[in-house]
């Protein structure tokens, strides 16, 4: 267990990681995820408004998260841009960059688009095996999750 006061990484605060908690739980994978996230944020050159990052099991259940959510290990983040709806083409660009960054550090990424913003995550080994060790993406803007909707992202 690590205690933070303030930022846990450049551009990201402890309050964004786990709001309302003075205790921060991090796993080895969390640190790798933060490295990827910092690289993505530097590339994006815009503030990412964090909706959700680390969640306890109880918090995850309250928001309807799946039991295997990467938020439980701090390896997923939900975010949006201020006063901007992310387009399909922007999302695809984000996916390509996120996949590249994750590969550079030896992990496999995932991304989802929603009406409120974007989910970026790192697949755990079980998820990666199930997903054929490929970048996984989805579109939930309709209110129903559509898996792998963009053919041009199949081989990133």
Residue spans for each PLM region:
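Extended, low-complexity, intrinsically disordered C-terminal regulatory tails
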Residues: 38-64
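Secondary-structure boundary/capping signal
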Residues: 48, 67, 106-109
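Extracytoplasmic cell-surface/polysaccharide-interacting catalytic and binding patches
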Residues: 1-43, 123-156
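A broad, low-specificity signal marking well-ordered, structured residues that form hydrophobic/aromatic
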Residues: 48, 77, 118
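Catalytic cores and adjacent binding grooves of peptidoglycan-active enzymes
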Residues: 73, 81-156
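Active-site microenvironments of hydrolase-like enzyme catalytic domains
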Residues: 63-79
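Amphipathic alpha-helical interface surfaces
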Residues: 33-36, 46, 59, 75, ...
């Amino acid at each position: 267990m690590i205690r933070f006061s303030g930022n846990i990484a450049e551009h990201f605060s402890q309050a964004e990681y786990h709001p309302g908690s003075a205790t921060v739980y991090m796993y080895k994978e969390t640190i790798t995820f933060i490295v990827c996230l910092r690289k993505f944020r530097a590339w994006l050159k815009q503030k990412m408004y964090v909706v959700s990052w680390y969640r306890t099991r109880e918090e995850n259940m309250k928001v309807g998260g799946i039991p295997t959510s990467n938020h439980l290990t701090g390896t997923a983040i939900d975010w949006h841009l201020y006063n901007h709806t992310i387009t399909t083409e922007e999302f695809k660009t984000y996916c390509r960059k996120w996949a590249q960054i994750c590969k550079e550090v030896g992990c496999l990424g995932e991304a989802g688009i929603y009406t409120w913003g974007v989910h970026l995550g790192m697949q755990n080994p079980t998820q990666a095996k199930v997903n054929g060790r490929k970048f996984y993406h989805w579109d939930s803007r309709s209110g129903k999750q559509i898996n792998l909707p963009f053919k041009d992202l199949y081989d990133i």
